Regions:
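Active-site core of glycosidic bond-cleaving carbohydrate-active enzymes
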Residues: 1-268
Length: 268
């Protein structure tokens, strides 16, 4: 959205150098390597920065090989840790969600290779294996959003789950995918849900994007810019789980900012 940004290039380059050994997952999470591939491809598509891309291509090709090694010939995912986001960490939807992220990464890589005139045979092999699966999502909205961006469509049942209870069940990390998928059928509804979700953050004093947020947290809780009143919940200290329990929950986190891309695409 902003042309070439040095901080973006340095961050992606840093992660490549930090995890340069084949088989080393970023932050021990295989899907982070997939997101790295997606980010590098998208950044090049938006900027045409060939000098930056040239530094990444060797490592990117290694990721394709690594993904192929981690997906069985029958389509089984053999990654050590499957991760979509924290709200799905203990839910079975993280398995199919990780597959969707892998499909998105493979498709972005294929588009990149095609533009550069490179052989896509290994990517095609990876995609063929990844498609050997029942693509059904049980209930998680963020995984339905990933399904749309991986496959290009969702079922009517998927859509019904996606819009059920409006902003309830949204994910900060996957906000772009959830809202974009809703907008593919009902742009105005997607914008309303965005306003309900991020507006609730603003109502609680947010000035930056929060690491995680559940609309239910707003019930009986105070704002972050003052101490809780007697009987109020502390929306910062009393919520969160996994690695961000209590005050470890970041109130300024980039992975919640996907809504900016949604606004740029749908709210002009």
């Amino acid at each position: 959205m902003y042309g070439r940004v040095g901080a973006v290039e340095k961050s992606l380059d840093f992660e490549r150098r930090r995890h340069k050994y084949k088989g080393k997952w970023m932050c021990s999470l295989s899907t982070y390597n997939m997101w790295w591939v997606i980010c590098v491809c998208e950044y090049y598509f938006m900027t045409g920065a060939k000098d930056f891309l040239g530094k990444q291509m060797g490592y990117l090709a290694e990721q394709i090989d690594l993904f192929n090694e981690s997906v069985g010939e029958n389509g089984e995912l053999k990654y050590e840790c499957l991760y979509v986001d924290w709200p799905t960490m203990d839910h079975e939807d993280k398995i199919i969600g990780s597959r969707f992220i892998n499909i998105i990464a493979a498709k972005k890589a294929k588009e990149l290779y095609t533009r550069l005139g490179l052989d896509t045979a290994e990517i095609d092999r990876l995609l063929a294996k990844l498609m050997m699966s029942d693509m059904k999502v049980k209930e998680k909205k963020q995984v339905i959003g990933l399904k749309y961006y991986a496959l290009g469509s969702i079922t009517d049942d998927d859509y019904a789950l996606l819009i059920k209870d409006g902003a309830s069940g949204l994910s900060t990390f996957m906000s772009y995918f959830i809202l974009g998928t809703i907008a593919s059928r009902d742009k105005e509804l997607a914008i309303k849900i965005m306003k309900d979700y991020y507006g609730a953050m603003l109502d609680k004093g947010a000035t930056t994007f929060w690491e995680d947020f559940d609309i239910e947290w707003t019930i009986g809780s105070g704002r972050i810019d003052r101490l809780p009143k007697p009987g109020e919940k502390d929306i910062h200290g009393d919520f969160g789980k996994y690695c961000y329990k209590g005050f470890r929950h970041s109130l300024c986190h980039a992975w919640s900012s996907g809504v900016i891309k949604f606004i740029e695409e749908y709210c002009k």
